């Protein structure tokens, strides 16, 4: 339901008092019908629930993280994304129902929410137990040639040629110079199956042909790995504490139950109350998820 249609459903509103009618109240602030109209003009393609959620999030997260997410930070992020997309930026925004003018406030809300999530992770998730769990599967940086082929036959032929003799190995390394990469177990650019095989290799060793199917495209690739410089993590977990924290951070950012719990925490902290019955279930996806996870 989009803003224009939903606003008609607001109950008990005459033309004279509808603009000042409260939709959502919270500590020290409120969201009125007039605020929703204003937001709908800026984001005409966004569903009403999304508009109201973002209005609420912007207000409650600004209280705690407004000083962290500055206008300069937002502008820098917007520029970075714009540069990344180049000439496709406008069309990418259109697909999301955004314009260049509305993208900045949209990004600000996203960054405020991210700041709240990251704060909660830092305060509650970097425990000894979580660090030890991350440590179990962590492998530090290695450097290797990681070469992919589109068929198993091509990969097998390339591997056989590389392993045949020193000349074959030298030719393999010269041909695939751009495929020489440094990665660890947190890297997203190297498939998990390839990492698992690579971490078992000694310097100068080749892997067998490794099959990996992309979860995003469904395409299967066939990899060959030659280890250049392996590493051992040893027994000192503290040496890699920052890397392990990043493992935990990435995991929690992708955990929808955790993220919903963070949002629910701030909704409760700010006593956010939906006054208009048409939007009674506006935040249920966060509060119900939080309740179910805490009761387990």
Predicted region positions:
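Peptidyl-prolyl cis-trans isomerase
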Residues: 158-200, 238-239
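C-terminal soluble interaction/assembly domains
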Residues: 225-241
């Amino acid at each position: 339901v989009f803003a224009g249609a939903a606003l008609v459903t607001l109950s008990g509103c005459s033309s004279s008092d509808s603009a000042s009618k409260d939709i959502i109240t919270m500590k020290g602030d409120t969201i009125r019908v007039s605020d929703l109209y204003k937001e709908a003009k800026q984001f005409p393609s966004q569903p009403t629930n999304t508009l109201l959620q973002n209005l609420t999030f912007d207000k409650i997260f600004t209280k705690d993280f407004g000083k962290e997410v500055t206008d300069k930070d937002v502008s820098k992020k917007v520029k970075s994304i714009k540069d990344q997309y180049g000439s496709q930026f406008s069309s990418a925004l259109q697909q999301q129902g955004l314009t260049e003018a509305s993208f900045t406030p949209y990004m600000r809300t996203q960054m405020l929410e991210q700041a709240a999530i990251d704060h909660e992770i830092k305060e509650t998730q970097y425990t000894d137990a979580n660090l030890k769990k991350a440590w179990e599967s962590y492998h530090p940086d290695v450097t290797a040639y990681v070469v992919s082929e589109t068929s198993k036959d091509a990969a097998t032929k390339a591997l056989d040629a590389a392993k045949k003799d020193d000349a074959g190995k030298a030719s393999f390394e010269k041909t695939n110079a751009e495929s020489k990469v440094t990665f660890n177990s947190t890297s997203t650019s190297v498939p998990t199956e390839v990492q698992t095989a690579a971490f078992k290799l000694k310097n100068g060793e080749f892997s067998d042909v490794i099959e990996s199917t992309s979860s995003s495209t469904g395409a299967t690739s066939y990899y060959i790995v030659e280890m250049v410089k392996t590493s051992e993590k040893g027994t000192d977990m503290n040496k890699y504490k920052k890397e392990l924290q990043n493992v935990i951070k990435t995991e929690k950012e992708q955990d929808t139950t955790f993220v919903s719990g963070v949002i629910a925490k701030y909704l409760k902290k700010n006593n956010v109350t939906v006054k208009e019955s048409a939007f009674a279930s506006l935040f249920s996806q966060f509060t119900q998820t939080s309740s179910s996870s805490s009761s387990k």
